């Protein structure tokens, strides 16, 4: 085993337990994890983990460069004190697994590298230990990763918190509320494919055990104008596309929808229905499953989808002008679907879309609408239906998340953790009413942030007994007052202009702003600006100098969006809806309420003030999300875009406030445990109080009085360079410590190994000696008994088997069988066999027979098909000629060849005449005439059905096997043979006399092909053959010194052949 000490960017010591499974332990000098300080040694490459430790903390360039270094190394999280800055990597970094959750669970904030889970765990532990409500505020630009951060936080709490006693239903509903809210509240924008188009604040309630038992969601400023209009390259809310793509055929048929989004006016304006990064079909399945988890009944789902479909049908309602220029509905089919889906009367809806009800002096009058007004009424209804449905949806989810134990006494012991996912500061080329509200929201949150940050800093200084140094910072209360002040604020002026009688327009609102607000250091219009500034301001614009910079707003649409008017008769129509959800969204009490509803800006202001109070009552934690580029590409760092976000998120102001006093503070125990190795007096162990040990340590390190302060429980270090110098000294010291640790470890390890080996050797020796002694004694005893039994058996070996000789006889038999196993015959020709004892003679013969059969069987199994055919032919030749023909022994060692003539040696005309008949064997022969016995060269061909005699390119004779009656050959060494044919066959001229140099091979193959093995006659003396019709010929055979074939004087063919073998 080896101990490997290595300094890596996270400051971890790696102990290698297994070569393929390193065990990582983040250790200080005596085992305390202080990862943040450890990472300082790699700061030149990966930057600092806390911006507070930047030397040039006032430099925006240094701030961004530190972000760049960390982003380049896939380190997307960095702290500004307790604030977490997150850069969206646009890819999965595999840092959110269960293993990562366990790594951050129950660990101090600075003991592990910056991570979302570190913030989540710190907040959760504070909630449990201090019993104080907590809040995590997540802000950033669209596409910066706010929604993803919220989901990861919920995932962390769902995985790591203890399960409630009544199961994990609340936990599942908290998680499953996200897909539903994303479907109805998120959309694809130019900056983000899953952009939240509303602000969300979620409370998660925990019981005294730390288990989630309930929740509540607040939504802010849904962008309902997106329902009726989208910019180029953007989409409507996800749910519309999910329904069309993933909805079942039966559902779409019931809703009167078709799958093509291009068929719906509200879905085509952005010209971006399909997005490669979005799988609407899969998201639909997730959303539908989530609805069932959060207690939606099938009827409620059906009613909800009917409303979604009704918005699409409403967008397809078209109008045409009659002769009085009044609008009339021309799309009857869409109107029919609308009345059914919304549960209203068709005539009532038609009238509400084309007329406006006016109440004057107690009388109700219907005023017809022109085309423009009708389109406005239609779009206003669509926005109202969708936005109110969204509000109902949030209420429904809240009912599902509400704790069932709210009435029990233990409910008082619950604590709340709030998650705020809110839009970041927005500055576009064209900024309107929505950006005004969003930026006002950010101003209020920035005001709260500065207030709570300064308060937290001041409380920590006071608790530690450190003198508080006033911090100079920009107080944006002046901007908040400019927007929200009663009577003189922008919202009040906007409301007044919306409510006053007469012809109010966006420009009259701007004129009133100029008259009321001027002069103001943070407000500017074309009229109030100087000559130079007027060039950048149109007459219909005003500019606010926010904490994050200047933003120019166009007043176009301010009054309309703030009023958010819905004609009375449209409200009446929707109040009569038979759709249960619509009936809840449009309460009939609205009709009897004569009070004018609050404007959108006022509603938002009141909601925001309520939110600020909620957040002020909690202990805050902050996550600032940054988008690295607009192209959503991984690894791309757009410095201009990031500088813009750093400015609008107020990160430099945040850092400046944090650095106004001391840059670094740490508990005495942690500081001493990390750096005590730098001082001989504190190393290796300090026996006194940690505070006294730190005092000794800093004196040894030479800290100047202005560089640090000693608090009650912490040391405060003013400058990062002081900490860097200390960390660099520790790095040098650590190298020597690592060497000493390795040396001590090796010595200890090898000594322990030696002692183990020594103890093992002594134990093994002792055991082995005993074992050998016992084995020796047992062997001697066994040997004596065996010898005694063998002698007794030998004496009685000829007696019948009895207990006295059974052992001996078994020994003899076993010995024979073992000897036989070693001396088995090696092949079929080996006839050796050991002599068996008398008792095994019969068994020996049986074994010998079995052995021979086995060898023969193995030999037969091993031969190839070609060799098998060769042996079969040789066996037939042996059966025919062995002991009968004198030259047979000379043919035995010669292999039979498949053919003696190649195809190229046979005339093509002969092959053509044979047709498809294959040639099985071909050999050159000599034919002797039947009369004069003149020899003539010929070719003998064997086919499957006949023997063919060929002369050059001509078939001279064909003898079918059926007409071949026999074959004659002499017993001498000559090579003549006669093929006998039927005399009755008129086609044949007579028997054929042939001579072949390979007579044994030729006759064997002919006999096999013609199936005439038993028809070969071996004659002695002479052979008689049919020479023609009514005439026979005779061949006489005699022995001589050499082969001679001639015609004798008696007219016979005389053959003299030498005798090769003695009989």
Curated annotation (Swiss-Prot):
GO terms for biological process: cellular response to type II interferon; chromatin remodeling; positive regulation of cell migration; positive regulation of cellular response to insulin stimulus; positive regulation of protein targeting to membrane; positive regulation of transcription by RNA polymerase I; positive regulation of transcription by RNA polymerase II; positive regulation of transcription by RNA polymerase III. CDD domains: IQCG, MYSc_Myo1. One of its GO terms (molecular function) is ATP binding. Residues 608-630 are annotated as: Actin-binding. Pfam families: IQ, Myosin_head, Myosin_TH1. ATP binds at residues 88, 96, 139-148, 192-196. The modification N6-acetyllysine is found at residue 486. Keywords: Acetylation, Actin-binding, ATP-binding, Calmodulin-binding, Cell membrane, Cell projection, Cytoplasm, Cytoplasmic vesicle, Membrane, Methylation, Motor protein, Myosin, Nucleotide-binding, Nucleus, Phosphoprotein, Repeat. The keyword rRNA-binding does not apply. Residues 734-757, 758-786 form the IQ domain. Residues 885-1059 form the TH1 domain. The modification Phosphoserine is found at residues 408, 536, 864, 1041. GO terms for cellular component: B-WICH complex; basal plasma membrane; brush border; cell cortex; cytoplasmic vesicle membrane; cytosol; filamentous actin; lateral plasma membrane. Isoform 2 contains a N-acetylmethionine at position 1. The keyword ATP-binding applies. The modification N6-methyllysine is found at residue 383. Residues 47-731 form the Myosin motor domain. Isoform 3 is expressed in small intestine, pancreas, brain, kidney, skin, heart muscle, testis, striated muscle, spleen, liver and lung (at protein level). Expressed in brain, testis, adrenal glands, thymus, spleen, kidney, lung, heart, cochlea and vestibule. Expressed in sensory hair cells of the inner ear. Expressed in adipocytes. Induction: Up-regulated by serum. Myosins are actin-based motor molecules with ATPase activity. Unconventional myosins serve in intracellular movements. Their highly divergent tails bind to membranous compartments, which then are moved relative to actin filaments. Involved in glucose transporter recycling in response to insulin by regulating movement of intracellular GLUT4-containing vesicles to the plasma membrane. Component of the hair cell's (the sensory cells of the inner ear) adaptation-motor complex. Acts as a mediator of adaptation of mechanoelectrical transduction in stereocilia of vestibular hair cells. Interacts (via its IQ motifs) with CABP1 and CIB1; the interaction with CABP1 and CIB1 is calcium-dependent. Interacts (via tail domain) with PLEKHB1 (via PH domain); the interaction is not affected by the presence or absence of calcium and CALM. Interacts with POLR1A. Interacts with POLR2A. Component of the B-WICH complex, at least composed of SMARCA5/SNF2H, BAZ1B/WSTF, SF3B1, DEK, MYO1C, ERCC6, MYBBP1A and DDX21. Interacts (via its IQ motifs) with CALM; this precludes interaction with YWHAB. Interacts with YWHAB; this precludes interaction with CALM. Interacts with RPS6. Binds directly to large unilamellar vesicles (LUVs) containing phosphatidylinositol 4,5-bisphosphate (PIP2) or inositol 1,4,5-trisphosphate (InsP3). The PIP2-binding site corresponds to the myosin tail domain (PH-like) present in its tail domain. Belongs to the TRAFAC class myosin-kinesin ATPase superfamily. Myosin family. This is Unconventional myosin-Ic. It comes from Mus musculus (Mouse).
